[in-house]
Structure formats: C-alpha cells, structure tokens
Amino acid sequence: MLETVCEIFKEAYNRGWITARDGNASVRYAEQNYFYITPSGVRKQFMQPEMFKKIGINEGYYDQPPRRIYTHEILEYTDVSANLRPSGEFPMHFGLQKQITQPVRVVLHMHPTYTVAAMYKGINLQSLLNEFPELSRYTSIAPTVPEIEPITQELADATMESLEVHKGYVKYDIVGYDRHGVVAVDTSPWRAFEHIERLEHICKIVLSAK
C-alpha cells in the first residue's frame, strides 16, 4: 500500500499537481490502531515507503458529557523515518483517520492545477456534478472549504464538516480547498487518485470552454 502511494506521488509530480515538497497522504487499515502519514519536507517524487511516519491512535472516553477522545503518539517505524517529522497537514489526516471506519482508508491531498484555477475563478465544484455524468456517477464532491490557513486545526475541522464525516462514514469522495488544493478519500490509493484525476479533467474542460 505504501509503495502504491509513492507511485502516486511520482505520477502527481509528473502531472504538475504538486511541486517537489507539496502534497501529503495517509493510510490506515480499520483493524489497526495506527496509521501511516507522509513526512514533512521530503521531495515527494522520490518518496520511499520507509520514509512514512507511523502514528498511534489512542482512544478514550469522558463521562461528563459522554464522548470519545483521541490522542496520538509517534511510533517507531524505520531508522529513516525516525529522522523525519509528520506532514504539516497532520491535524487534517488525524481528524479523518481517527473517525472513518472503512476497512481501508486512504487520504490524499494534492494541488491539481485546473481544479485550483477553477475555484480561484469562482466555479462551484459541486455544480459540475449536474453537468458531467462521469462526475455524478463516480465521484461525489463536497462543498468547497473557503480559504483557510493551511496546516491548522481550523482547516482540519472545516474538512471534516464539508466531507460530512458522521458515525464512521464519509459522505463525499473529494473536497476542494479554495486557492489551495483538494483532499480525496477512498479505500485504495488509486481510487482516491482517480477522484482527483476525474475532477481535474472536468475543470480543464470547463476552463478551456470559457
């Protein structure tokens, strides 16, 4: 799985969806109380599986009022990983990985050119669902998250609200960050990648027609 994520970053870099140190991803299997996340500051086109950070998820409960709480810890993984820090978008990945209960959950964050350009021009990404059947059939688009400072808890909270994560399920496949990028969620790296690819293709068509 991690090897596949590395392949995806090479593909995203070759397509111009990210520059060398952009983008991030995380992977978790439902039965595991940990997940893997890309490190900060690494050239993503040269990502290797041993570079990922391994993050433990600890679950607890409060009685008053009754609610679950989650904490995290960095776990040992590889010697290479030990010298790296988790992605700056950790709050967003942790927020999604601790709540979604799909058997496998993959979260990809990229900066696809035409999709970001479409949002910059004020195009409502959700409105494209009604105009292009390949979107409405295969990719559900969440309401765009307004411009929020990256690598913040505020952005993480807005992401979960827009994707409508509730009782372990996520309603949408992809969400746009205004003037920033997108986050796609699915059960495999390539399925998440295809949501980004599909939306990017449609945005390119729309912008070319204007």
Where on the chain are the PLM-derived regions?
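Glycine-rich flexible loops
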Residues: 1-210
